[in-house]
């Protein structure tokens, strides 16, 4: 079979799928998916080239089958009597005479392939394929249409690590393993060329390749290289198929590989054809921007919560570990504590620790089941709560047993641990969604409509504002904090954006203080994580308010800075209930109570809990903790959720449905968002926070503007890039010069530099993360130099985006650091994500990524870069490969900025010199009106979303009102037509570039200008009784028209655009978009509105029904202060 058969001269069309659908999702609204006709063409419409067409057997003349059929068709298009049988027979005969040539690609794969053919593409050259010992399947070393080879793709996705080469390959049937220790994890294996010719030695990265004993046998450990580079096995080990072979092979996309791997988990013998079966790949409904009512809201979010719950359960219940060795101890509360480490595997301890910490998110309070399976004692099972997780000091996990009865404390071996999955948090989210839908009293009418995205007139709460906004016991507030507190107290729904170091916690505590002083019952304060709740609880307590910290019962044994405020500890100290104290003392001493005493103890405890909660000024708990049964019968008028951008929307709803009439969301959508483990749920929108959606709906957050954390030189770049230059410095350069610290910065007045490192990335032992040994060595040298210069270990933080690098750094510091091991143990090494909300005096950032083809992964996420750059108070040092990083526009800006500041350096640390490396000129988001936004600024949404019909950024409406309060976007920071190619490149832009200005709120009954009351806009109410909210404030049906709409009669203009409302826009006619100062002809001729850009928009907005259709028409006539 000749190569030409597949070349340009062949008559066979071969269609190759690209990975674009994997990246952007299929364009189901595009023209190729349009409904045309799902029936066979009529005989009179037979296409050219078919039977009867110009190229068919009955062709050019009048004599084909179609022609003969036509002759017998009557005037009304009905076949005459007797003609049917003849025509069918003749057509069948003609079709039988046709010789259809089978596509060679099809025949290539319909014939029986050998057993060792690649399970993805079918390539079966013995030199090119590798056997996966775990899944019992063969894969080739070719990339096909994916970024890595098929074997590496499989190993990573299936979490397999052991392989065997083919017996007919150049190296024979060989299991790849370490020559020294027998480790078979291919992600750990590498080779050292031996002195003898044509001999290589396979050794694992750690510990074997780093042992000093290698020198004794003439092996140079510095020459060690991994077997897998650029996500492919080295070609001398496993041959890479030729380009022709790969073109002839079955074409499979990354998206299909993903689906096939998922299918193999359930059915190992599944094939690509099985993917086509109905129901195999059902995608959940995507979240919307607006919802008709709370039932639709529940019907969309409920399945996503279930998806995440199912994924979480499957992951945690699959992680059973045998052969555990336990160390027993007795806690201060007389409870048994079991200490254990995860067993050593071929990949070393790192692999399992990563899975338990990163994938399973093991944390204090989680439940673990410990079983004894040996012969030295009776079989036993006990449940305990985790009280210690692995850290820099060791990999030990500790659990406190609920009951010590029968615990085999005399034995230490042959134990098994299982993760006990609990559905509590997911059940509470589902319950909150249901409550929101069915319970009228769950939230006020105003908040109900706002959360669903309905148009509601803004209102102001009449309240007595304090004369002095600073709370007692807390620092004085700056101007932006005072404005935030003052505004929030007067509004039913507020968003506060707190960039890094701007005093978000102090501001939140001050708001809670003033809300509590109003005497409207306890204020509920929540956050997604226990650490964030504890920090805020501590600050609120400083104001002198009565604060109760409500903990999950599984966390009562865990110590925290605010343990004395915890409900269970406050009950212990209640002098008003002596009987309860006696029973508690008896329980502590004996460990158990009689059934009668236990019953009495629980009743008294419930009474005490209720009394403390009812009398508290403030109750603090996690968002999921707000679903605790102890709060079930309480109603909270005022609710504040801190770090709300790190919570999923259903998580936020758990506290919200406890009666919210005044809701304050605090967060920063320019930092990292919620963690969603299930990719399908994340892709459907569960990873978008409520805060973000409300911002897109046009509720403009109040931004805190003075930062008190960073040296001014450190805050300049994040301010310009992420916050449009709006951050002011509350500290001077002199405030951020450390006394007794002698470190030579390349620029003495700028405590920062980018240290150019040319090392290569490697896949970590888990197969799902990366590490960079050269960077790790440089990080150790920098850490040592900082310590010698006078920095204390606990003042230094090392952060990296990759768990593999974090784990490698911990081990490298211990074994290769030139100072005492204990010093390095006190240096915190963590992922960027784990450092959010934290700060250190000095931060070292290891970027890790350095490759030719793979890109830079989630370093691409601007929010991750923002978090990484804003953790330091006194100095930042970035270690990375500029060549790889500069390909991404945002990093290009960062590197160019460091070069401008003469802080891009290379060479030995004691003699740093400015790097001569040159970068292409950064692409700028040109904004002539607002020079402060000259950098490519960022947030969660990119330029394409500025034209989503239905969002606040929709520019489709004509005839903009002139009144400045009712414009749909800010004239000062509009996006000009010039940089619109940015949209096609996915370059993020800031919210403020398309954000509407904040209109003045209206008091109840206040008219908005001379046109007030001139019409009633269309409204949507989710449930009866929502027309009036619980303030007695006007619902959406009582909104008034702004004066700019006085000349338009709503009834006669059903599709006219209201002040801040969104109308229907056809994505097939982007030229209808309007911008101030830009006429229609100008815009319609602009190059970026060509087919390429249009198709990208269509792909991104494939959930077209989210924004268009009947709902868009309904919104078309709504007017008033719609977004606030």
Swiss-Prot record:
Location of Phosphoserine modifications: 10, 31, 560, 951, 1084, 1102, 1105, 1122
UniProt motif [ST]-Q motif 2: location: 1102-1103
Binding site for ATP: 481, 501-505, 671, 708, 839
Bias (Polar residues): 1036-1053
UniProt entry keywords in alphabetical sequence: ATP-binding, Cytoplasm, Helicase, Hydrolase, Metal-binding, Methylation, Nonsense-mediated mRNA decay, Nucleotide-binding, Nucleus, Phosphoprotein, Repeat, RNA-binding, Zinc, Zinc-finger
Binding, Zn(2+) 2: 132, 135, 154, 160
Reaction catalysis annotation: ATP + H2O = ADP + phosphate + H(+)
Amino-acid positions noted as binding Zn(2+) 3 in the UniProt annotation, renumbered to this chain: 178, 181, 204, 208
Chain intervals for the UniProt region annotation (Sufficient for interaction with RENT2): 1-410
Region CC/SHH/C, annotated ranges: 132-160
Top EC class for this record: hydrolase
Molecular-function GO term, any one: chromatin binding
Protein's GO biological process: 3'-UTR-mediated mRNA destabilization; cell cycle phase transition; cellular response to interleukin-1; cellular response to lipopolysaccharide; DNA repair; DNA replication; histone mRNA catabolic process; nuclear-transcribed mRNA catabolic process, nonsense-mediated decay
EC assignment: 3.6.4.12, 3.6.4.13
Entry's Gene Ontology cellular component terms: chromatin; chromosome, telomeric region; cytosol; exon-exon junction complex; nucleoplasm; P-body; perinuclear region of cytoplasm; supraspliceosomal complex
Compositional bias (Low complexity): 1066-1081
Region (Disordered): 39-69, 1004-1053, 1066-1091, 1105-1124
Biased composition annotated in UniProt, kind: Gly residues: 51-66
Subcellular location: Cytoplasm; Cytoplasm, P-body; Nucleus; Cytoplasm, Perinuclear region
Domain comment, as recorded: The [ST]-Q motif constitutes a recognition sequence for kinases from the PI3/PI4-kinase family.
Name of protein: Regulator of nonsense transcripts 1
Native source species: Mus musculus (Mouse)
């Amino acid at each position: 079979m000749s190569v030409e058969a597949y070349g340009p001269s062949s008559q066979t069309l071969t269609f190759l799928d690209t990975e674009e659908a994997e990246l952007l999702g299929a364009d189901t609204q595009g023209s190729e998916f349009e409904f045309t006709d799902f029936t066979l063409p009529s005989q009179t419409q037979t296409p050219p080239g078919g039977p009867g067409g110009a190229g068919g057997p009955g062709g050019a003349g009048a004599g084909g089958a179609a022609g003969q059929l036509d002759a017998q068709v009557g005037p009304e298009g009905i076949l005459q009597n007797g003609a049917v049988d003849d025509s069918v027979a003749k057509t069948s005969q003609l079709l039988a005479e046709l010789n259809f040539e089978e596509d060679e690609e099809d025949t290539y794969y319909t014939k029986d392939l050998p057993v060792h053919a690649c399970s993805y593409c079918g390539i079966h050259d013995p030199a090119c394929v590798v056997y996966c010992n775990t899944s019992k399947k063969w894969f080739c070393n070719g990339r096909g249409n994916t970024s890595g080879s098929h074997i590496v793709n499989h190993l990573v996705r299936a979490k397999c690590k052991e392989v065997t080469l083919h017996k007919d390959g150049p190296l024979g049937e060989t299991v790849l393993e370490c020559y020294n220790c027998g480790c078979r994890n291919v992600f750990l294996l590498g080779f050292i060329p031996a002195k003898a010719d044509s001999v290589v030695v396979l050794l694992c990265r750690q510990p074997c390749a780093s042992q000093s004993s290698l020198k004794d046998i003439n092996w140079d450990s510095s020459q060690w290289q991994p077997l897998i580079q650029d996500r492919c096995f080295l070609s001398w080990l496993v041959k890479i198929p030729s380009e022709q072979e790969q073109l002839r092979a079955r074409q499979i996309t990354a998206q299909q590989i993903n689906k096939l791997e998922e299918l193999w988990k359930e059915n190992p013998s599944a094939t690509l054809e099985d993917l086509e079966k109905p129901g195999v790949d059902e995608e959940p409904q995507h979240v919307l921007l607006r919802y008709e009512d709370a039932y639709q809201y529940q019907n969309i979010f409920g399945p996503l919560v279930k998806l995440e719950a199912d994924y979480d359960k499957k992951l945690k219940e699959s992680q059973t570990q045998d052969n555990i060795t336990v160390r027993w101890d007795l806690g201060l509360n007389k409870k048994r504590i079991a200490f254990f480490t995860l067993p050593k595997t071929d990949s070393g301890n790192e692999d399992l620790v990563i899975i338990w910490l990163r994938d399973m998110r093991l944390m204090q309070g989680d439940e673990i089941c410990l079983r004894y399976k040996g012969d030295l004692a009776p079989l036993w099972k006990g449940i305990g709560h985790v009280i210690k997780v692995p850290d820099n000091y060791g990999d030990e996990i500790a659990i406190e047993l609920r009951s010590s009865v029968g615990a085999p404390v005399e034995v230490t071996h042959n134990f098994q641990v299982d993760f006990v999955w609990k559905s509590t948090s997911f059940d509470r989210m589902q319950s909150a969604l249901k409550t929101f839908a069915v319970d009228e009293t769950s939230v006020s009418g105003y908040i109900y409509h706002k959360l669903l995205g309905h148009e509601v007139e803004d209102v102001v709460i009449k309240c007595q504002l304090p004369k002095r906004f600073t709370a007692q016991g807390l620092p004085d507030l700056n101007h932006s904090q005072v404005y935030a507190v003052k505004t929030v107290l007067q509004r039913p729904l507020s968003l506060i954006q707190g960039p890094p170091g701007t005093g978000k916690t102090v501001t939140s505590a001050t708001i809670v203080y003033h809300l509590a002083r109003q005497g409207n019952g306890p204020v509920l304060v929540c956050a997604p994580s226990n650490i964030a709740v504890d920090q805020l609880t501590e600050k609120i307590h400083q104001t002198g308010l009565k604060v109760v910290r409500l903990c999950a019962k599984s966390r009562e044994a865990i110590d925290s800075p605010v343990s004395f405020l915890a409900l269970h500890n406050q009950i212990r100290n209640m002098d008003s209930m002596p009987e309860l104290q006696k029973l508690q003392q008896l329980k502590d001493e004996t460990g158990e109570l009689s059934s009668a005493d236990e019953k009495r103890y629980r009743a008294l405890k419930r009474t005490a809990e209720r009394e403390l909660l009812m009398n508290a000024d403030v109750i603090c708990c996690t968002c999921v903790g707000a679903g605790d049964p102890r709060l079930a019968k309480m109603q909270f008028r005022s609710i504040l959720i801190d770090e709300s951008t790190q919570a999923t929307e259903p998580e936020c709803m758990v506290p919200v449905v406890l009666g919210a009439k005044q809701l304050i969301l605090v967060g920063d959508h320019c930092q990292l968002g919620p963690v969603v483990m299930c990719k399908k749920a994340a892709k459907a929108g569960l990873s978008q926070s409520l805060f973000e959606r409300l911002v897109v709906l046009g509720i403009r957050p109040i931004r805190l503007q003075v930062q008190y954390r960073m040296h001014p030189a450190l805050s300049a770049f994040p301010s310009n890039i992420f916050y449009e230059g709006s951050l002011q410095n509350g500290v001077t350069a002199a405030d951020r010069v450390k006394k007794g610290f002698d470190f030579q910065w390349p620029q003495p007045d700028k405590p920062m530099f980018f240290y150019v490192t040319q090392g290569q990335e490697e896949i970590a032992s888990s197969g799902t993360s990366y590490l960079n040994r050269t960077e790790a060595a440089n990080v150790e040298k920098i850490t040592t130099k900082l310590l010698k210069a006078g920095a204390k270990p606990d003042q230094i933080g090392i952060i990296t985006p990759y768990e593999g690098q974090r784990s490698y750094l911990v081990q490298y510091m211990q074994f290769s650091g030139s100072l005492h091991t204990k010093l390095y143990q006190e240096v915190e090494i963590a992922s960027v994500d784990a450092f959010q909300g934290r700060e250190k005096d000095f931060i070292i950032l290891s970027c890790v990524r350095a490759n030719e083809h793979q890109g830079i992964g989630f370093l691409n996420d601007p929010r991750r870069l923002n978090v990484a750059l804003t953790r330091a108070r006194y100095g930042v040092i970035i270690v990375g490969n500029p060549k790889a990083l500069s390909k991404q526009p945002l990093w290009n800006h960062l590197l160019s900025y460091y070069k401008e500041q003469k802080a891009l350096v290379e060479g030995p640390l004691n003699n740093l010199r400015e790097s001569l490396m040159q970068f292409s000129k950064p692409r700028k988001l040109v904004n002539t009106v607002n020079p402060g936004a000259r950098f490519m600024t960022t947030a969660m949404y990119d330029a394409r979303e500025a034209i989503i019909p239905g969002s606040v950024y929709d520019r489709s409406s004509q005839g903009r009102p002139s009144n400045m309060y009712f414009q749909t976007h800010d004239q000062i920071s509009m996006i000009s037509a010039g940089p619109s190619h940015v949209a096609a490149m996915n370059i993020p832009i800031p919210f403020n570039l398309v954000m509407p200005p904040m209109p003045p709120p209206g008091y109840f009954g206040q008219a908005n200008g001379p046109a007030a009351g001139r019409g009633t806009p269309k409204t949507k109410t989710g449930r009866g009784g929502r027309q009036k909210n619980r303030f007695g404030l006007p619902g959406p049906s009582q909104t008034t028209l702004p004066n700019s709409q006085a000349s338009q009669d709503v009834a006669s203009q059903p599709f006219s655009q209201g002040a801040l409302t969104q109308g229907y826009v056809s994505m097939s006619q982007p030229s209808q978009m309007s911008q101030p100062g830009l006429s229609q002809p100008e815009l319609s001729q602009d190059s970026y509105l060509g087919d390429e850009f249009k198709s990208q928009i269509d792909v991104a907005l494939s959930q077209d029904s989210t924004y268009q259709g009947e709902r868009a028409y309904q919104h078309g006539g709504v007017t008033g202060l719609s977004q606030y």
